[in-house]
Amino acid sequence: AAKTVCVVDLPTLTGPPGNPKIPRFFKELPAVTLEQLYALIGPDMKAVDAVIRDRLYSDVVLVRQVAEYIINSGGKRMRPALVLLAAGALGYQGTRHHEMAAVVEFIHTATLLHDDVVDESDLRRGRDTANAMFGNAASVLVGDFLYSRAFQMMVAVDNMRIMQVLSDATNVIAEGEVLQLMNCHDADVDEARYMQVIHYKTAKLFEAAAQLGAILGQATPEVE
C-alpha cells in the first residue's frame, strides 16, 4: 500500500455539514517527496533567499562574514518552506510570507550559532562551525544580531498576532536550550523530559512557521 501524508484539502475548509465552525482540512493522499513540495514554492523560495541576502547586511564587516558563513552553510530551509506552504494553502496572495519566512530562518540560524558555542561543536553539516572559524564571542554576538534583525522585520509587518507567536516561540526555544543543558549528562532522563526538550528546542519553531502562514492567510483560530 502507498504511504500517506496529511495535506491541506482546500475544498473542505468550510467544515463538516452541521458544524461549519470546525475546519475539515486534512485528507489522506499518496505521500509526496520534499522535492515535490519544494517545486510548488520554487519562485517563492528564491524570493526568500533574496530577502535573506538583503536583510543580512550590516555595516560591521564581521557581522556580515559570520552571518553569511552560517546562512550559506547548507540546509533545506524547511522552516521557511513551511511558512510558504501554509500561506499558499490558505490562498495568501501578498509578499509578506517572504519576509516572515526569512524571519524564521534568521531565528533558526541564531539558535544554531548559540547551540554550537554551548555544545563546543567544531563541525556542522560537514563544515567547520562558525565558532570554530570566528571564535565563540563573534558567534554569540552575531546570533544576537540575527535575533534582533528578525524582530526588526517582525515589527515592520505591524501584526501583533505574528509578534506574539514569534516572541513566544523564541522564549520557548531558549527554555529548551536550558532544559537540554540541565539534562545532557543525566543517564536517567525519562521520555517525557526528552520529548519536552525536543518540543521546546526544535518543534516549537516548526509550529510557529506553520502558524505564520495561517495568520497571513487570515485563517480562523481553529485552522491556525
Predicted feature locations:
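Compositionally biased, low-complexity intrinsically disordered regions
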Residues: 2-3, 17
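Mg2+-dependent prenyl diphosphate-binding active-site environment of isoprenoid biosynthetic enzymes
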Residues: 36-47, 53-224
